[in-house]
């Protein structure tokens, strides 16, 4: 099980102006978290803060700036943090309708910060690509990882049916299968968190939910 990360209250870069790569990484995280987890206690926020050497509170603040740019959040009657919104708005406008490009770009940035490569981080180095191009496999892996993060966070890392909360035993299952509807592959409303047994039952057509 993944080790929990404690509060990141100081960072080597906490007094420096925000850079483009940081704002992109935070937007990438924004699209993978529900509104209720845009705070400094969320493990993914702490992990990113540690990676970019910022405080967890400062990363959480940028996340709420992005919420102030999000029409879905605003239409629901909720508001993000308006102060600082202008820093995030250009990146929102660039990537909100091109999330796949954002997710790939963010993973490249992470790999670079870890002194690694995207291929190594995704575990596809030297792999038999089964006739697919490396670019296609990278895109699939990144999108699948993002979808998993979205769904597990939305369900608070619990199987929707059994309540089991062991991440290694949870699957981000598509309601409409991945191969059948490209438009909804990354739509969190098309996902449900299941244990392996119920995921397999779903895949063979057993109706688990209405």
What residue spans do the PLM features occupy?
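Short alpha-helical "recognition helix" segments of helix-turn-helix
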Residues: 44-49
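Short Cys/His-centered divalent metal-binding micro-motifs
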Residues: 56, 193-209
């Amino acid at each position: 099980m993944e080790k929990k990360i404690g509060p990141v209250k100081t960072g080597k870069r906490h007094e420096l102006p925000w850079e483009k790569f940081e704002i992109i990484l935070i937007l990438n995280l924004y699209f993978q978290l529900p509104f209720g987890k845009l705070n400094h206690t969320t493990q993914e926020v702490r992990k990113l803060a540690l990676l970019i050497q910022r405080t967890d509170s400062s990363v959480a603040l940028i996340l709420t700036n992005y919420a102030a740019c999000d029409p879905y959040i605003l239409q629901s009657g909720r508001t993000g943090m308006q102060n600082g919104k202008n820093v995030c708005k250009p990146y929102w406008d660039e990537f909100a309708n091109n999330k796949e490009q954002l997710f790939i770009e963010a993973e490249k940035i992470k790999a670079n910060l870890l002194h690694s490569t995207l291929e190594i981080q995704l575990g596809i180095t030297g792999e038999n690509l089964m006739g697919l191009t490396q670019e296609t496999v990278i895109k699939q892996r990144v999108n699948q990882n993002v979808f998993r993060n979205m769904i597990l966070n939305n369900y608070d890392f619990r199987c929707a049916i059994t309540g089991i909360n062991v991440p290694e035993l949870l699957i981000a299952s598509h309601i409409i299968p991945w191969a059948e509807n490209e438009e909804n592959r990354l739509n969190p409303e098309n996902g449900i968190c299941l244990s392996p047994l119920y995921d397999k039952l779903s895949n063979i057509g057993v109706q688990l939910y209405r």
